[in-house]
Amino acid sequence: MALERTFSIIKPDAVAKNVIGAIYNRFESAGLRIVASKMIHMSKEQAEGFYAEHKERPFFGALVDFMTSGPVMVQVLEGENAVLANREIMGATNPADAASGTLRSDYAASIDENAVHGSDAPESAAREIAYFFSEEEICPRTR
């Protein structure tokens, strides 16, 4: 088992539903520790930069509009195999396909407004964490 970090976003739809605490409880109940967290309202430039890999996809404009439509919570999660653990907690990208009891099954309305984002690999996690957090903002949990 490898101790690793992953990046997570609670998207505008879930923030609007006031389920931040419930989502944090799921992370912690699964053994993940929140080592950095902040609420931000992404600018168009931030959202375009973060999702730059999707720039040529037909959904890019709608994704940027959605991610800038309200505040989001960005956080760094740490734990054993954190990337995979968080992806299991989130469930399938499309909430219609998400297993019962996952975040997307419980809190997402559609594939477009699917409540949460999580890194898909340790390499993307490192890049995404650095996009929103300086090393000084991350507080390792040693106790």
UniProtKB/Swiss-Prot annotation:
This is Nucleoside diphosphate kinase. One of its GO terms (cellular component) is cytoplasm. CDD domains: NDPk_I (cd04413). Signal peptide: none annotated. InterPro entries: NDK-like_dom (IPR034907), NDK-like_dom_sf (IPR036850), Nucleoside_diP_kinase (IPR001564), Nucleoside_diP_kinase_AS (IPR023005). PANTHER family: NUCLEOSIDE DIPHOSPHATE KINASE. Its cofactor is Mg(2+). The active site is at 117 (pros-phosphohistidine intermediate). Homotetramer. Keywords: ATP-binding, Cytoplasm, Kinase, Magnesium, Metal-binding, Nucleotide metabolism, Nucleotide-binding, Phosphoprotein, Transferase. PROSITE patterns: NDPK, NDPK_LIKE. It comes from the Bacteria. It holds the Pfam family NDK. GO terms for molecular function: ATP binding; metal ion binding; nucleoside diphosphate kinase activity. It comes from Alteromonas mediterranea (strain DSM 17117 / CIP 110805 / LMG 28347 / Deep ecotype). Transmembrane segments: none annotated.
